[in-house]
């Protein structure tokens, strides 16, 4: 059996088209370190929120669907990383996600 399995990280964050932030930065950095990054996007933004104006596509209603599919696949994560959460409902979804997917050795960031 292959003993050195690739560690999986769930990255709960937005995807911003401009600004060198969020999933556009996290995925390549963690991937280059040898991790499999599994994004759970919270929103898609045209650019990060420090610009004076931005477009925002809320993915709150999609998050439980993605999580349900991961449960069906019996996915296990070695770490769960959270970034931008756009609403109190997303905070609850992520709290439940962490409770459902964490295990004794999980790193929660």
Regions found by a protein language model. Name each.
Residues 3-11, 15-19, 25-109:
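Ribokinase/PfkB-type carbohydrate-kinase core domain
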């Amino acid at each position: 059996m292959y003993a050195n399995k690739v560690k999986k990280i769930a990255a709960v964050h937005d995807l911003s088209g401009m600004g060198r932030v969020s999933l556009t930065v996290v995925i390549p950095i963690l991937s280059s370190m040898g991790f499999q990054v599994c994004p759970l996007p919270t929103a898609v933004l045209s650019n990060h929120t420090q610009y004076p104006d931005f477009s925002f596509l809320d993915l709150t209603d999609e998050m439980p669907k993605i999580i349900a599919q991961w449960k069906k696949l019996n996915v296990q994560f070695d770490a769960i990383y959270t970034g931008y959460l756009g609403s109190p409902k997303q905070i609850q979804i992520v709290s439940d996600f962490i409770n459902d997917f964490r295990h004794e050795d999980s790193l929660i960031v």
